[in-house]
Amino acid sequence: MMGTAHHNQTAGSALGVGVGDANDAVPGAGGGGYSDPDGGPISGVQRPPQVCWERFIQKKTIKVLLVDSDDSTRQVVSALLRHCMYEVIPAENGQQAWTYLEDMQNSIDLVLTEVVMPGVSGISLLSRIMNHNICKNIPVIMMSSNDAMGTVFKCLSKGAVDFLVKPIRKNELKNLWQHVWRRCHSSSGSGSESGIQTQKCAKSKSGDESNNNSGSNDDDDDDGVIMGLNARDGSDNGSGTQAQSSWTKRAVEIDSPQAMSPDQLADPPDSTCAQVIHLKSDICSNRWLPCTSNKNSKKQKETNDDFKGKDLEIGSPRNLNTAYQSSPNERSIKPTDRRNEYPLQNNSKEAAMENLEESSVRAADLIGSMAKNMDAQQAARATNAPNCSSKVPEGKDKNRDNIMPSLELSLKRSRSTGDDANAIQEEQRNVLRRSDLSAFTRYHTPVASNQGGTGFVGSCSPHDNISEAMKTDSAYNMKSNSDAAPIKQGSNGSSNNNDMGSTTKNVVTKPSTNKERVMSPSAVKANGHTSAFHPAQHWTSPANTTGKEKTDEVANNAAKRAQPGEVQSNLVQHPRPILHYVHFDVSRENGGSGAPQCGSSNVFDPPVEGHAANYGVNGSNSGSNNGSNGQNGSTTAVNAERPNMEIANGTINKSGPGGGNGSGSGSGNDMYLKRFTQREHRVAAVIKFRQKRKERNFGKKVRYQSRKRLAEQRPRVRGQFVRQAVQDQQQQGGGREAAADR
């Protein structure tokens, strides 16, 4: 009997709710014995009377109001709920569900509603329930297939205890009784959650309407439907406690008009509710202060200094003068300014403002010195990023109490008015320039006169220098003969190499109004005027001697291979590790008036795979090609990896700023020669391969012919070769038989 009673218990018994009945009296003889299966009493077996707990435990099942407009979903969820021992009251829409809720005889324990429904939506139904004095104690669980964060937050902020995402699992429905138990436990006053107020959550401004139901009339849930911070009256079970949501018990909202004290922010130790923090980007950035307070003025001054230093560190805006209060009831939680309780004197205010201004100036000076050091290290940088600096507010501003100061880190150094040269240079640095990574860099590269280490220095020597060079006894002079400043004119790391006594005079190129673009001479007349410049490899050239020595060694090795009378030029270095084609701007400022400009420039050629040397115009693959045009200059290209010389002779073509006969696409004479050489190599390789294949096939053919001849000589009998002797004997025997027949 007792076993049968235990067997009939269901999930409701686990809640302390009995659903099965048991007999009050045990049948049998004497009222105390058991009976056998046939009905006869069993004597001699006496047991004490049993206690049926079902008589004392109230029988109750949890009633769930299921609201869903979809018939199939409603039927499936209803079946699952009934299988979990819940009593289900289905409703097709929100209006019908509200009718069931208004009828107090239904005694609904839990509401499970869909968010998106025609007519009265789930959020509207939730708002009505939360505004009702009696129905607001009923837990409301929202369910939807849309799990957008805005929709979930809006439902939970309006008072829903949970949000289920479809498809709903059976285990989730089994645990719905916990919400009812938690609500009853909190409203009875026996738990630690009693007396906790629910948080008023303002309407979100982040466009949550896009995540809401599109086919529902959700206009009536915007005004007067949000739970407030007012304490509930004592009409709820006589306990005078506030109904608690399972998730927003301590939903701290920074932009809330009512600020909470630290003791209100603390959760109970046994709280099972989550914490939701709602931030607003336009207000929360002004309130990044911890909840601490100081009652001593000295400590307050030290705290002000500390927070000013922290302001300089993180760059967060703060108002050190007035505490921002949206309502008179709001408590100021800023430790830097407790004006209502501890007003500051005017002297302390001025001192604080002066300290802030001094700190700002010191920070600006520190940043300026750092920027100066970086500029000194990167003096060869071609372009500078624009400085996005903001103004530092002054302490003597009249409208300072109404403006939130924004103390941001600036890369622009605060300079004096007397430093005109630095001011002009700083303004020019702030000008937006095109980067070296631009698509137009390969065609036009501006050379700035005020930037150190960025200009190209081309050596141009008159034709009369050859006779002067023959009189010089120094074979290799590694020192530069020009008196130009190495840093300003970009000649740092460059060398002037004189081969076989030839003296080269450096002409410092500066940007002028009338510039001549010197193009490379054409090596092959049939190809027209094409550029023979090699792609220059540019890298950062720090002001040290090691890079200069290495460059001098490379140039010296290249000069040793050159022929006498050639015009050498300076090695070019550029601070950007970028490979692109460059046109050199050479002015006729320092050149001879009657002497022609040679316009020769040495650039580094990146290594070319598959070639042992540079093939020149004259067909010589020795690495250097010598020209014979006396009046015309020669363009020399120095390879950094293998110091071979490549000279293309021709005429110097002069064009205006808008013209130019160089293609700039890498299809110059050198590229043509390289491609031609590659083509020759490929043709030779193909011919050699075909010859080898022909020889190999010829050998195979010979072997095949010999085997064929042997096969004809040695006939097969049943697929096997037969010896020649056996074959001859057979032939002789056959001849004898024929003769006998005759």
UniProtKB/Swiss-Prot annotation:
Keywords: Biological rhythms, Nucleus, Transcription, Transcription regulation, Two-component regulatory system. Residues 186-195, 490-502, 618-634, 719-731 have a biased composition (Low complexity). Residues 682-724 form the CCT domain. The keyword Magnesium does not apply. Pfam families: CCT, Response_reg. GO terms for biological process: cytokinin-activated signaling pathway; phosphorelay signal transduction system; rhythmic process. PROSITE patterns: CCT, RESPONSE_REGULATORY. The keyword Ion transport does not apply. Residues 63-181 form the Response regulatory domain. Residues 656-667 have a biased composition (Gly residues). Residues 697-708 have a biased composition (Basic residues). Residues 186-249, 290-346, 375-402, 478-570, 590-671, 697-742 are annotated as: Disordered. Induction: Expressed with a circadian rhythm showing a broad peak in the middle day. It is found in: Nucleus. Residues 299-313, 331-341 have a biased composition (Basic and acidic residues). InterPro entries: ARR-like, CCT_domain, CheY-like_superfamily, Sig_transdc_resp-reg_receiver. GO terms for cellular component: nucleus. Residues 236-248, 318-330, 380-390, 503-512 have a biased composition (Polar residues). PANTHER family: TWO-COMPONENT RESPONSE REGULATOR, TWO-COMPONENT RESPONSE REGULATOR-LIKE PRR37. Controls photoperiodic flowering response. Seems to be one of the component of the circadian clock. Expression of several members of the ARR-like family is controlled by circadian rhythm. The particular coordinated sequential expression of PRR73, PRR37, PRR95, PRR59 and PPR1 result to circadian waves that may be at the basis of the endogenous circadian clock. Belongs to the ARR-like family. This is Two-component response regulator-like PRR37. It comes from Oryza sativa subsp. indica. The gene is PRR37.
